[in-house]
Regions:
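Conserved pre-motif C helix in the palm subdomain of viral-like polymerases
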Residues: 87-118, 136, 163, 212-243
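Catalytic-core region of right-hand nucleic acid polymerases
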Residues: 56, 104, 108, 162-186
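Inter-domain linker/hinge segments that demarcate the starts of reverse transcriptase
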Residues: 10, 14-22, 50-57, 105-110, ...
């Protein structure tokens, strides 16, 4: 665990405020006070000095204005279902800009102190890591074990409204364990003392109501605080279950145990036997329940990866309820199949690309729109959709052919031609200015990913 240092409780400096103002994004909607981020960015040196005094006053006293503890929730319709039903809207919390600035200064100190303490299992909200890391890890585990003729057992756990269910007292205990205490802890807690929210629909604003549980939505501190909270869950589960998960061995001879992969609250439990997976699931559920997190049994799935397709069924239960066994699971947006066939994922990505292309059909086939604008849409929307997670693929000739067919479909739409026109593919590429093929982009991504893996520290995976 990190050591609680003097730097964490030192006065807030002018440089910290300047850096926090600099990284804040402009163009964000202000809260009820009407103060926008641009006001701080354009304020100059004097504004930074006044902000530094104000933030230090709050830091020393351990108290923040009520406006900083208030959230204005604006419901946004999801696009389906009855608009009058709350479950069909997503609430966006608008917070005071100066309060967000203060939170950014605090969480930077906490991150610097605790980043090295969080386990390698967690890739959410961490610098230099992302969904691709976890997707790659899942595929590699399956590939290596299946190559040895061994089965891999997965449980993809769904935590119901995890952010909103975090027990604050448990969170404070976790922060103390990670060396966050004294004035810094009180500063974080000050945002949660009598925190409140209201709902704004159009020009109408509801009465204020108190929020007593969960992390603050829209607060820059919340993602990292949640990481620390979940790392506490991981540690407790690992300490309780002996001989857990999988044993992984490096070429250097170093070995470690892998039982969980996390991206924020997306949790995948893994073991080399059904019995071990049952123990992991049971212990994970127990720890979550003790910390007042609820596992959604209906949305949690289990899967057995095997070379023969896993003809025999597995029975994993949580609180007496049987978790559904699936043949394929969409993990972090990527299809994981029980026989680990990349073909399934490529088909899925092409299907998603077709949906995007269909939505853009009227634009892509518009003869009055310039080719440069069409290329921009293709490069910025279509390509990222199709090649999401391509770094983890091992594409064969059939997958390359499938990608090429989809690509030419897009380019013909951009060029305003069809197969009936019998125009050579190279001519279509020349007309659209798209010389680099999708399969070449996949190869480039794989090579770039290889470099990323080579640059990782020895303790990373």
């Amino acid at each position: 665990m990190p050591v609680f240092g003097e730097r964490l409780v030192a006065d807030i400096t002018k440089e910290e405020v300047q850096e926090a103002v600099k990284v804040m994004k402009a163009g964000k909607a202000p809260s009820l006070d009407g103060v926008a981020t641009e006001c701080l960015k354009m304020g100059g040196v004097k504004t930074v000095e006044w902000l530094m005094r104000l933030l230090n006053l709050c830091f020393v006293s351990g108290v923040v204005p009520i406006e900083w503890r208030s959230a204005c929730i604006v419901p946004l319709y999801k696009g389906k279902g009855d608009k009058n039903e709350c479950c069909n809207s997503r609430g966006i919390s608008l917070l005071c800009v100066v309060g967000k600035l203060y939170g950014r200064v605090l969480i930077k100190r906490i991150r610097e102190s605790t980043d090295g303490a969080i386990g390698e299992e967690q890739c959410g909200f961490r610098s230099g890591r992302g969904c691709t890391d976890q997707i790659f890890a899942v595929r590699q585990v399956c590939e290596k074990y299946l190559a040895k003729g061994k089965d891999v057992f997965w449980a993809f756990m769904d935590l119901e409204k995890a952010y909103d269910k975090v027990d604050r007292e448990a969170l404070w205990r976790v922060l103390r364990l990670y060396g966050v205490g004294g004035k810094l802890l009180k500063a974080v807690q000050s945002f949660y003392v009598d925190s409140r929210a209201c709902v704004r629909v159009g020009s109408e604003v509801s009465e204020w109501f108190t929020v007593k549980v969960g992390l603050r939505q829209g607060c820059v501190m919340s993602p990292w605080l949640f990481n620390l909270f979940m790392d506490g869950v991981v540690r407790e589960v690992n300490a309780s279950v002996l001989g857990r998960g999988l044993e992984l061995l490096e070429a250097s001879g170093r070995s470690w145990q892998l039982s969980q992969l996390l991206f924020a609250d997306d949790t995948a439990l893994v073991a080399d036997s059904e019995e071990k997976l049952c123990r992991l699931v049971s212990e994970f559920g127990r720890v979550c329940e003790r910390r007042k997190l609820r596992v959604n049994v209906g949305k949690s799935k289990v899967m057995r990866c095997s070379r023969d397709g896993g003809a025999s069924r597995i029975g994993v239960r949580l609180n007496g309820e049987l978790l559904e066994e699936v043949q394929c699971f969409k993990y972090l947006g990527s299809q994981v199949e029980k026989m680990e066939l990349v073909e399934t994922e490529v088909k899925s990505r092409v299907k998603e690309g077709c949906k995007v292309l269909g939505a853009l059909k009227s634009v892509m086939s518009c003869r009055t729109l310039g080719m440069e604008a069409k290329r921009g849409l293709y490069e910025g929307v279509v390509v990222p959709t199709v090649l999401y997670g391509a770094e983890t693929w091992g594409v064969r000739a059939e997958e390359r052919r499938r990608l090429n067919v989809f690509e030419m479909k897009c380019l013909r739409s951009m060029a305003g031609v069809t197969l009936r026109d019998r125009i050579n593919n190279d001519v279509v590429r020349f007309r659209t200015g798209m010389v680099k093929r999708l399969e070449e982009r996949v190869d480039a991504r794989v090579l770039r990913w290889f470099g990323h893996m080579e640059r990782m520290d020895e303790g990373d995976w």
